[in-house]
Amino acid sequence: MPNWTNNTLNLTHEDPEMIVRARDAFARGEFINEFVPTPGSEWNYEWCVSNWGTKWDVGDNQGINSITDHELVVYFDSAWSPPVAAYERLQDLGFTVYATYYEPGMCFAGIYDEHGDNYFDLSNMDSGDVQQQLPSELDEMYGISESMAEYEAENQDEVTQWYKDGVEATGLEPHILSKDSNV
């Protein structure tokens, strides 16, 4: 079972037929394969990861957020990573691609646009770091710093309770450290 990456994709194209094609492929769950087709009839892990940037195709009818003649906005989950390699191919086909992504299990997020992939490793960040270092659009879209702050508070509560339970169980005197303590 993969870790799922949350994605939002905004596609624009001068040709309305390309937008319709993208919408229809997304609704079928064959979005990437429509524009970057797999060779042969068999699925190939290495080929998909190399040419799509992710293990499996994406899309379903539920994830279509909005569509106009020249724009399609969708959201979807992808296996392990965003389909950045597919985005590059879409740009070659005349699409303008703007995508955001967040993978909470592996602690990364990013924005992909015409300048490439702006990737953020969150693994050594706390909620304050995320608020300061991530673009606010990305943080707000996925609620990253808010989720991290909730986790930090829950974790602190668990550690505090664990300490209190241990002191009580062993009959020791509680030791209170100040915030300025180096101990």
What label would you give each PLM region?
Residues 1-183:
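Long, contiguous binding/interaction regions
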